[in-house]
Amino acid sequence: MLFSGGQYSPVGRPEEVLLIYKIFLVIICFHAILVTSLKENAGNSSLLSPSAESSLVSLVPYSNGTPDAASEVLSTLNRTEKSKITILKTFNASGVKSQRNICNLSSICSDSVFFRGEIVFQHDDHYNVTQNQDIVNSTFAGVLSLSELKRTELNKTLQTLSETYFIVCATAEAQNTLNCTFTVKLNETMNVCAMMVTFKSVQIRPMEQCCCSPRTPCPSSPEELEKLQCDLQDPIVCLADQPHGPPVSSSSKPVPVVPQATIFSHVASDFSLAEPLDHALMTSSTPSLAQETRLPSPQPTISLTSSPAIDLPVQHVVASSSLPQTDLSHTLSPVQSSIPSPTTAAPSVPEKVVAISTPPGETVVNTSSVPDLEAQVSQMEKALSLGSLEPNLAGEMVNRVSKLLHSPLALLAPLAQRLLKVVDAIGLQLNFSSTTISLTSPSLALAVIRVNASNFNTTTFAAQDPANLQVSLEAQAPKNSIGAITLPSSLMSNLPASEVELASRVQFNFFETPALFQDPSLENLSLISYVISSSVTNMTIKNLTRNVTVALKHINPSQDDLTVKCVFWDLNRNGGRGGWSSDGCSVKEKRMNETICTCSHLTSFGILLDLSRTSLPPSQMMALTFITYIGCGLSSIFLSVTLVTYIAFEKIRRDYPSKILIQLCAALLLLNLVFLLDSWIALYNARGFCISVAVFLHYFLLVSFTWMGLEAFHMYLALVKVFNTYIRKYILKFCIVGWGIPAVVVSIVLTISPDNYGIGSYGKFPNGTPDDFCWINSSVVFYITVVGYFCVIFLLNVSMFIVVLVQLCRIKKKKQLGAQRKTSIQDLRSIAGLTFLLGITWGFAFFAWGPVNLTFMYLFAIFNTLQGFFIFIFYCAAKENVRKQWRRYLCCGKLRLAENSDWSKTATNGLKKQTVNQGVSSSSNSLQSSCNSTNSTTLLVNSDCSVHASGNGNASTERNGVSFSVQNGDVCLHDLTGKQHMFSDKEDSCNGKSRMALRRTSKRGSLHFIEQM
């Protein structure tokens, strides 16, 4: 255009030529500006577009004004290398929108300052930072490159000296350099020159003026910092002769002083203990982070500190050598509290000094050193050693500890355990006259409550409003609480008698900042919540019968898509320095801004009568759990079949033994069903539901014991009190006793205290999760209402069982040897049936002690969970009359019995006729319900004699009569469980000519002798 304009300009008219020339100049300038703008936009677009070769994306690369730091880094790279870099966002701090106000970053971030640093690593540089030899032995797929080594050292240094930091690094392989730009957040007491001493070619600039307002919150993430568009000031210059002194700014304009106001530690505590979501695609940028973290599993105690944790997938990540080389990495990490390694220059700096120029030109110097912190801690320890503390002095100590929590983490780490002991000692030595007392400070809250170990109620400690910390001690946590811990009523139920008097107070602590809980072994994990703890008179309590529930709010509620983990503080980890452990902890519920920590729930049937109430090894607990649930499931199925059979077929339920058996089967079925539901209900940790389930489980257990005892009592009436025994409304009275007495016992326990029931823990599984169960929490209630109750029933049942065995031995002495052999198997089957019917197998619980504990626990679990199955086998499937009813109504074809089949007819070799006066045999030798209840339900008889007693004739015209039929001395042992007793006047064959039957009628007491020739 310039050429064409010059071509057609009129000659001899200088004014017009000059005007056209000016117009051309304006157009040229406009085009130049336009071309420059397009180039910049194209450059930004290329940076914002993802690269196919990049295997790792930097979430927050920062850029500043002119000259841009990222541009300087990128300018050193060639075209191919630039294509490997993927930048999602740029941080433009040069342009400030006119419609927004400019404020100082220090005015909204109290006690914290931000710096921007730039450093270039050369291949032949020798830094005063020694290389960590663990890098060579790390789990990276290949040998670490120069960029990875230098980036690791930079990461470790920033991790030690700063609160939060962000790194952007780019490798220029052509120039053999590594260019890194980082942003750090430091406590105002930290001297930034200590960082400059570590690396010799670093340039650090303060970040002060930003687009913000006084109401703008302090940035806690790279995105928030980017939105503020902070401008960079002139680089800081440290004096050569005073490398650890105050930094001197090269700018003539003063730097505003950081006001001493509210603490910014909420942000520092906002990061969780967590692992990256995808371990396969990410490795650590530091040697210690390259390996997967494995947590030990110490036994948890009540002296615990809990916090949920959350995965941060962008932490400490670089590309593995097996993937395409990534030239850009991003690190977001809180400081890990640990003693500074010799690989950094931090330990050589005994005192951190920061000098900040005030607007008038004055200098304010804040100092913080290890000797100073140790002196303060020692002073408090000395005061605590003198004895009890008055509330005023204790409050001053709490405030002092609160201030110390905001000291540089590198200086605070060696004193962390001592400070935790100081906090516990304050609560232990605190002298107060009321029931409860609470002391609060900006970053620490402490509450102590006097308790009675023998009558401890459920207590919840909750903290509210982190800006103005308040605490409460109630039965339930308030809705607006930011952290709460609930101690169950069974907390001290297992304490030895010598420690009951010592457990006089419970202490709760709430830490607004996790400064004392830095775990160097979890470098890729960080906290997302506050920290809450509890202890009982500074003692350790193990084997809690009910879990402790911890609910903690997330400081940053936007992290909902990340995986959380519940952890507690183990004082014995890391060589006594303490560390986070997830042993036995799991997440019950996770919401947008809250995590509730609890544990998984399974249990063994042996818990119901675990007299020792001690925990089993995890592997054995798992095996017992499988046996328990399989056995309970099978028993429930076969008990249901037994109930349906006896209820559906009227002919087999007319006698008393059958009716008692129906009641026992119903009780056992309900017991098994409630037991199977118990662990599932316990998962929800709902107090009301758990108490209800525990009450029903207790009730049906006692009902089952009672009906077993009534079976034995019925046998006593039939075998011992044979004559002159008449009970009106026999079954009705049995039902009142069988279902009523357990209800009275459970009602008394509930009236005393509903907290006698609840969630209890009875051991651990191999994965570390505790075995929790809704059951009786009080040991006194357990031993009286379960163990004592069962002992009475068990003694009665064993006595009756012995009577049966004695009767069997007496009769067998009269039998011939050949006849004894033929009945041995039947007798054994009868004994086995009585063993399960009377609950003799429950006696295994009395032997589950000492070295044989495990063996009898297995026997207990196997036989008692299968009790319903064995009852079905011996009292349903093995009974001839029951099988005939099945064949008659359930089978078809040849297996089905004819309608006119006399199912109850007894076939004998010597007896061809039946008389109406013949005695009637019943299944359990029981009392007859009426004169018409004549159907036989005999289980086992001698095959050489009568298969079944006749059920076709009337035994007596009186109600509740007892009939006994004797044939040649053959005793049906099962019949001895009820109302039948067989004897003979002489030993003869089954077809003998003379038989005698003894019949008693309850009203007349007369004897009828029927002799058949």
Curated annotation (Swiss-Prot):
Those parts of the protein on the Extracellular side are 38-623, 685-688, 755-785, 852-853
Residues in GAIN-B domain copies:
457-615
Please report the organism this UniProt entry assigns to the protein. Answer: Rattus norvegicus (Rat)
Pfam families for this protein: 7tm_2, GPS
Where in or outside the cell it occurs: the entry states:
Apical cell membrane
Q: How is it modified after translation?
A: Proteolytically cleaved into 2 subunits, an extracellular subunit and a seven-transmembrane subunit. Highly glycosylated.
Q: Where are the transmembrane segments?
A: 624-644, 664-684, 689-709, 734-754, 786-806, 831-851, 854-874
Annotated glycan sites: 44, 78, 92, 104, 128, 137, 155, 179, 187, 366, 431, 452, 457, 524, 538, 543, 547, 593, 777, 853
Sites bearing Phosphoserine, chain numbering: 1006
Q: Tell me the superkingdom of the source.
A: Eukaryota
Is this entry keyworded Phosphoprotein?
A: yes
Give the matching SUPFAM superfamilies: Family A G protein-coupled receptor-like (SSF81321)
Q: Where does 3beta-hydroxyandrost-5-en-17-one bind?
A: 864
Entry membrane topology: Multi-pass membrane protein
Query: Domain description from the entry?
Result: The Stachel sequence (also named stalk) in the C-terminal part of the extracellular domain (ECD) functions as a tethered agonist. In the inactivated receptor, the Stachel sequence (also named stalk) is embedded in the GAIN-B domain, where it adopts a beta-strand conformation. On activation, the Stachel moves into the 7 transmembrane region and adopts a twisted hook-shaped configuration that forms contacts within the receptor, leading to coupling of a G-alpha protein, which activates signaling.
What exactly does this protein do?
A: Adhesion G-protein coupled receptor (aGPCR) for steroid hormones, such as dehydroepiandrosterone (DHEA; also named 3beta-hydroxyandrost-5-en-17-one) and androstenedione. Involved in a signal transduction pathway controlling epididymal function and male fertility. Ligand binding causes a conformation change that triggers signaling via guanine nucleotide-binding proteins (G proteins) and modulates the activity of downstream effectors, such as adenylate cyclase. ADGRG2 is coupled to G(s) G proteins and mediates activation of adenylate cyclase activity.
Regulation of this protein's activity per its record = Forms a heterodimer of 2 chains generated by proteolytic processing that remain associated through non-covalent interactions mediated by the GAIN-B domain. In the inactivated receptor, the Stachel sequence (also named stalk) is embedded in the GAIN-B domain, where it adopts a beta-strand conformation. On activation, the Stachel moves into the 7 transmembrane region and adopts a twisted hook-shaped configuration that forms contacts within the receptor, leading to coupling of a G-alpha protein, which activates signaling.
- Listed name of the protein: Adhesion G-protein coupled receptor G2
* Site, as annotated: Cleavage: 602-603
Q: What is its main location?
A: membrane
